[in-house]
């Protein structure tokens, strides 16, 4: 068992003392840090936000925002479709630093398709196709999300459609995990188009719109569509699950037994992505092998299969199934690709078990050897206990039950109180570094354990000017200093 306790050093009392149960009063968000007000006005429009935020009375203030039910009631009374005042159909919702490169036209799904569907024949990873926005990192996470319907339904809320007889009012809602809260985000269904086609994320089925509206809701969460250009897949996977991400550098610090890590993570329903670093001189450069530099991919399956060569030699091969969020024919063309002769070494029954399909759909298989040779980063999002319970699974590792718990603490840097500055002020005057919020880790009993540390920061004056900045500090730094704080009773 591991215990985490917040510590606070007062400038007036330079000795470190543990806080009691009233510690949240020190770290609570006040009017000087208008986080709750900002969330409430822009995103906190669902009952989930009101329930999970014990520190925010403003989430319950209906004068600050409308709930989904309020929006539906207003639309029914007026007979008009909803138009989101917080994320309007204007250029500023698309770009914050420049004007749109084209004359985009905002259209509702009924103006794009004669028979629009929210989800048609179930959501799948093939519903996720990238448009004219560099957010492959987001699409890789969305494609992974579709692998687990129970988790998907927590983000893409069910019972939404375009049927006027079933409360269709032009409003759709999604849920995202941000700063220890499930935030419900409502958007209207006006989508940017050019020449009658969706500009950004879309489904392979032109009549299906759940993925396009999900991207719009996430763009609203981040401030604009442009804010989605370039990002971290692990961040979006955490936003979809409330889980904790782990990032592996395959170039400078490749982990031992990566295949085992990937296979166990897949068995535990973790979300997995991989990526190739960008060429600074070329945007998303396609390589001769069919892979794309500066691009993120979904890992959709991890298998170890039996093979037999034409000469009768037998063995095992480790295979990774990868999906390009672009869809289409831009796929890996090396060993174990769609047209590779290696597949003749696997029995027909084994191929059926693998769900093997040879199509120009953006999905392909690679050997572990080629995966390590070409991919440069792997990001794994381990589900939190709530999401894990949703998929009805337990951690089984070598016949030993594994379980884990999550503890979260909210803190703020307040001038004159908890803003102690960087490590430069640890030993030199005014020696204020200890005033920063601290958390002591205590190993309450003997035995092995794994401790993952994830720190996110909210900045109302983020670089994009739209109020959200989420940073995952280096876990390596945390691990290197962890020994200073571990103690046993």
Segments (PLM) and residue ranges:
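Structured alpha-helical subdomains that flank or immediately precede key functional sites
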Residues: 1-489
